[in-house]
Amino acid sequence: MSPSPAERAEDLRRQIAQANRAYHELDAPEIPDVDYDRMVRELEALEREHPELARADSPTQQVGARPSGRFAEVRHAVPMLSLSNAFSDEEVADFVRRIDERLGRRSLQFSAEPKMDGLAISLRYEEGHFVLGATRGDGSTGEDVTANLREIGDIPKRLNGKDWPDVLEVRGEVYMARADFEAYNERARLQGGKVLANPRNAAAGSLRQLDPKISAQRKLSFFAYGTGEVQGGELPDTHSGTLAQLGSWGFPVSALCRVVDGTDGLLGYYRDIGERRDGLPFDIDGVVYKLDDRAGQQAMGFVSRAPRWAIAHKFPAQEQSTTVEAIEIQIGRTGAATPVARLAPVAVAGVIVSNATLHNADQIARLDVRVGDSVIVRRAGDVIPEVVSVILDRRPQGTTPWQMPTQCPVCGSEIVREEGAAAWRCSGELSCPAQRKEAIAHFASRRAMDIDGLGDKYIETLVDAGIVKGVADLYRLSRDQLLHLKLVLDAEDPSALAAALKLHLPAEGSGAVLNAVLKLDGNDPGWRAQALVQPASFEWNTKKIATKWADNLIAAIDASRAATLERLLFALGIEHVGESTAKALAQWFGDLELIRHLPWPLFKRVPDIGGEVARSLGHFFEQQGNQQAIDDLLQVGQVRISDAHAPSAKLREGLDLAQLLVESEIPGITRLRAEKLVAALPSAQAVLDAEHGQFVNAGLPDDTARGLAEWLDAEGHGAMLLAAEKAMRQILAKAPALAEIVAGPLDGQTVVLTGTLAQLTRDAAKERLEALGAKVSGSVSKKTSFVVAGTEAGSKLDKAQSLGVPVWDEDRLLAYLAEHE
């Protein structure tokens, strides 16, 4: 029996009130906006049809609404910085307040503009001619995509007008308009080609094509939003004026840019653009606010990798409700078992979402997500779908809490979780095929071993076929295998592959191979791996198959055999070990054999390596499978370390058994207590052989003595302490004496570089200063020893002068380097 209008209205008011409280008071929305709006509209209709149901406290009467490596590297003369984000009105108000307090102004003007969802690039013009275009990259170094950028009609090849600077770098966003995106995909569908995922990926992928003709086919657009390096000329003293000037020189500038006053102006602009967002011809994911006057920008300066005078105000992530059909786990490169919700497909933020991350088991427990639940799915940052909450009112009867599986779904190994860790992991290490694919892809990546040309699809097929079972197998690949692989991957189905193979197999004896290929099921996702079975011989017809790709890949594999220690350590894919940590390990220990057999507490000798990273390193090297993989690399792959050296003498500082006990994180063991213990028990073996009473006699409190005894009794701790003592002796034997360290003339001094140097690149100057012992910093303070100022020096020079920090010009720097190097 259907409820009466009065009953339905009351039920709607209850649900809306509950949703309002969850959203506004608890900051934990239980339903997506689309469901909330639907309920409000239904209640409005009921109150119109039945005026007697209208009440003063009805939600419909309340005022207010919620706010809606294949390219050459290019070193950016001026870094392409990122922006801090604001997600609320309060954060925007705080941004304005910080500027007001720092500058002491009561009236602030800002330039506001849409935040394009594309790819940031830098365009360099010399004497008015476009000479170089680069991607953002890591902010300091990007990729040279000049040829592809020349295919974009919006980008002027020569500047209009006059009075442009001798050197002008223009920063902006390459994007694909929605209409062009839809048109391209429609053509691709009709022609049986590849359909692009979304406009942002389309723009990024197009610019990274080796063939500029592909960029031309995928019609791209451009908006300018700022400048980088400027030499031999001046720009207007406001950001808005600079944009207008860029427009006069031929650069497209968004017609949605506005100059607004204060917080109210910013929020008004934000809401205006938010309301127009869906009707715009391009995708945006927020708006950007910049202090308009350059003098104020210079006074505000920068923090970390972002300016203090600008911020991105992101739109709320779009949400929708759907049903959880299953919860599965995916195994990542480092073995992390990540739960993934398989969803009834739903459109969210313009794309169909059928999977969403649940992050980890603790998150599932916190949300209590169950199979069969109705959930809210959000595309966080408009990119990554995630389950944010469960709609408990819709939970069906009979659901049960989800439990983490005990075995890896890929290799069957046990799934374990380290004490205190959030993530569960497959214990199969590199023997797990799921980890193997990701590990090999990471190993071959540009910043690791830099095996250019070995893409994910090649790795996946090689692993599935059993040809590559570990990273060392990459060094066994032959030219014939790679050419065969290319044929298999290029073929749309087994029939097409058989036709291609027929051109290259000898006429006699090829029938069995071709028949085997034709029997493969093209609907089976693994048919390509099954087809990758090397025939007895190939007679490659080089007129009909391109061999350059295979030759280049073999050359890249061979070149990677000579690796720096930091590259190899990073390439191993050890959890928590990024490039900077790998570099530090290489600098401090210098030797792979030492590192791979080092107990984890000794890794903490390296500055900035704490217990979590040290334990991760120890765990990795404790696994026999990982040690075997390293052995295979050295023996089968013939990989060699090109820059091995003795451990740093600085490792000697304070390195003794007492420090080992402290760094082993034994409960209650401080440096003072460890020294007392070692004075009575001077070796690791003596500590292991001692009993509780001896620990007390050595000066330990009773509870600490009991804790030490329990720690030593725990599995593996005693062996680890003995191994750590042995490794400590090896380090002390190999490391130079501290007295042998020759202090550089700039040891202990901090130097800041600013402006453009004529005879040195900034990287070269930094390297030479560091070689003399200096620390090169990015910011000026009272502790700065001196500042080297080139041309176009900016706020750093001003700050140095205000603080009385000595300033050197380039000539003085060059003279000093010549004298002391």
Swiss-Prot record:
**Cofactor(s) needed by this chain:** Mg(2+); Mn(2+)
- Gene3D superfamilies in the record, alphabetically? 5' to 3' exonuclease, C-terminal subdomain (1.10.150.20), 6.20.10.30, BRCT domain (3.40.50.10190), DNA ligase/mRNA capping enzyme (3.30.470.30), Helix hairpin bin (1.10.287.610), Nucleic acid-binding proteins (2.40.50.140)
Offer an example of a GO molecular function term for this protein.
Answer: metal ion binding
The UniProt record gives the binding positions of NAD(+) as: 33-37, 82-83, 113, 136, 173, 290, 314
Which cysteine residues pair off into disulfide bonds? none
A Pfam match: DNA_ligase_ZBD
One GO term of the biological process aspect? DNA repair
Q: Which UniProt keywords apply?
A: DNA damage, DNA repair, DNA replication, Ligase, Magnesium, Manganese, Metal-binding, NAD, Zinc
Listed InterPro entries: BRCT_dom, BRCT_dom_sf, DisA/LigA_HHH, DNA_ligase, DNA_ligase_AS, DNAligase_adenylation, DNAligase_N, NA-bd_OB-fold
Question: What residues form the catalytic site here?
Answer: 115
Catalytic activity, per the record? Answer: NAD(+) + (deoxyribonucleotide)n-3'-hydroxyl + 5'-phospho-(deoxyribonucleotide)m = (deoxyribonucleotide)n+m + AMP + beta-nicotinamide D-nucleotide
Q: Name one GO cellular component term.
A: cytosol
Keyword field contains DNA repair = yes
Query: Where in this chain does the record put each BRCT domain?
Result: 741-821
- Does this entry carry the keyword Nucleotide-binding? no
Enzyme Commission no: 6.5.1.2
Q: Give residues annotated as binding Zn(2+).
A: 408, 411, 426, 432
Q: What does this protein do?
A: DNA ligase that catalyzes the formation of phosphodiester linkages between 5'-phosphoryl and 3'-hydroxyl groups in double-stranded DNA using NAD as a coenzyme and as the energy source for the reaction. It is essential for DNA replication and repair of damaged DNA.
Q: Which PANTHER family match?
A: CHROMOSOME TRANSMISSION FIDELITY FACTOR 18, DNA LIGASE
Instruction: Tell me the protein's name.
Output: DNA ligase
Q: Which organism is it from?
A: Stenotrophomonas maltophilia (strain R551-3)
Q: Which gene encodes it?
A: ligA
